């Protein structure tokens, strides 16, 4: 039943994504983190201690609520248990919502104004976007799709196979903390330290699996697989995070473009190394290719994880 539940969760994610009006665990996590940060602004606790408290309570709540919901559902009826299981699993995946948001940036670049495109990309990236050029908007979108292929899809999918929705929701809490407070700016450097470090740890394996799946997907989509391999290997550590460049490097190599470089976060210029080679301008159409890589790597991961799961079930 576990395999069927995972496949149904992936199917639901691909079909409906995350409608804005629907309740969603990650939204609740984000609201809790936001409220805690408002409290910190008023009370000015020790930033390191508050950062630890924020991480511990957010992850603890995600773990505890997931366990509690499944336990209560199991007490009520086995069918309800699996319905809750599938919902939590579906909510942990973000392929459709990621592709949908990237598509909105693409359509705004192609058919809207530059100001609209800047606002649209600002919905999915943490950097300041008010001065971005069309090429920089395309780069930012591709970087987000590439990085979140690991954080938003392959990582949760791996967790579902290893520990079900409880592990997947715990993983999502760790990711959400990093995305909200894990910055190196003056405001977040101390508060977000533990969130950033724990996110690095949680994504060590998913990032490297995503690297492999993206290379395989580059071959399936008849992209530059040699470039994906070469740049993917050469530039896999060209990032402050030990994980983020793994997926970005493969995508940059497969598309023959350059990503990365300095960005402005919360009013501060943060220097970042470049990834890939500046062989041609980055275009809006490259966003579509990045989305194709997202979906293909998701299917590749699902197939390979399933095969591994079946082998483990047969022999252990």
Curated annotation (Swiss-Prot):
Residue ranges of coiled coil: none
Picking any one GO biological process from the record gives:
cobalamin biosynthetic process
Please name the gene that encodes this protein. Answer: cobD
UniProt lists the family membership as follows:
Belongs to the CobD/CbiB family.
A Pfam family annotated for this chain is CobD_Cbib
* Keyword Membrane on entry: yes
Write down what this protein is called.
Cobalamin biosynthesis protein CobD
Gene Ontology cellular-component terms for this entry are: plasma membrane
The record's function comment reads: Converts cobyric acid to cobinamide by the addition of aminopropanol on the F carboxylic group.
- Pathway assigned in UniProt: Cofactor biosynthesis; adenosylcobalamin biosynthesis
Q: Where is the signal peptide?
A: none
Q: Where in the cell is it found?
A: Cell membrane
Give the lineage: Bacteria, Bacillati, Bacillota, Bacilli, Lactobacillales
> Which keywords does this Swiss-Prot/TrEMBL entry list?
Cell membrane, Cobalamin biosynthesis, Membrane, Transmembrane, Transmembrane helix
Organism listed in the record: Streptococcus sanguinis (strain SK36)
InterPro entries assigned to the protein according to its UniProt record, in alphabetical order: Cobalamin_biosynth_CobD/CbiB
MF terms from GO for this chain are:
ABC-type vitamin B12 transporter activity; threonine-phosphate decarboxylase activity
Residue ranges spanning the membrane: these are: 45-65, 78-100, 151-171, 209-229, 291-311
The protein's topology relative to the membrane is: Multi-pass membrane protein
């Amino acid at each position: 039943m576990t395999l069927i539940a995972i496949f149904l969760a992936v199917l639901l994610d691909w079909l409906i994504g995350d409608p804005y009006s629907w309740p969603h665990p990650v939204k609740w996590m984000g609201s809790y983190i936001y409220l805690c940060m408002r409290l910190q602004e008023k009370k000015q606790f020790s930033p390191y201690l508050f950062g630890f408290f924020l991480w511990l309570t957010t992850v603890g709540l995600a773990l505890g609520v997931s366990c509690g919901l499944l336990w209560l559902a199991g007490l009520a009826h086995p069918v309800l248990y699996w319905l809750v299981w599938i919902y939590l699993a579906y909510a942990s995946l973000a392929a459709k919502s990621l592709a949908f948001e990237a598509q909105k940036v693409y359509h705004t670049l192609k058919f809207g104004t530059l100001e609209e495109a800047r606002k649209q990309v600002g919905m999915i990236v943490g950097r300041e976007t008010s001065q971005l050029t069309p090429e920089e908007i395309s780069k930012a979108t591709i970087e987000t799709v590439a990085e979140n292929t690991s954080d938003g899809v392959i990582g949760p999918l791996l967790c579902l196979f290893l520990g079900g929705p409880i592990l997947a929701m715990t993983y999502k809490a760790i990711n959400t903390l990093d995305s909200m407070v894990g910055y190196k700016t003056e405001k977040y450097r101390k508060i977000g330290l533990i969130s950033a470090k724990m996110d690095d740890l949680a994504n060590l394996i998913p990032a490297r699996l995503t690297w492999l799946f993206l290379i395989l997907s580059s071959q399936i989509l008849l992209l530059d697989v040699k470039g994906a391999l070469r740049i993917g290997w050469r530039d896999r550590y060209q990032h402050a995070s030990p994980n983020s460049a793994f997926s970005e490097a493969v995508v940059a190599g497969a598309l023959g473009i350059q990503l990365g470089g300095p960005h402005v976060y919360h009013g501060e210029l943060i220097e970042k190394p470049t990834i890939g080679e500046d062989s041609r301008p980055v275009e809006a159409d490259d966003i579509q290719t990045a989305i194709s890589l997202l979906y293909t790597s998701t299917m590749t991961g699902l197939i390979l994880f399933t095969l591994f799961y079946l082998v483990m079930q047969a022999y252990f």
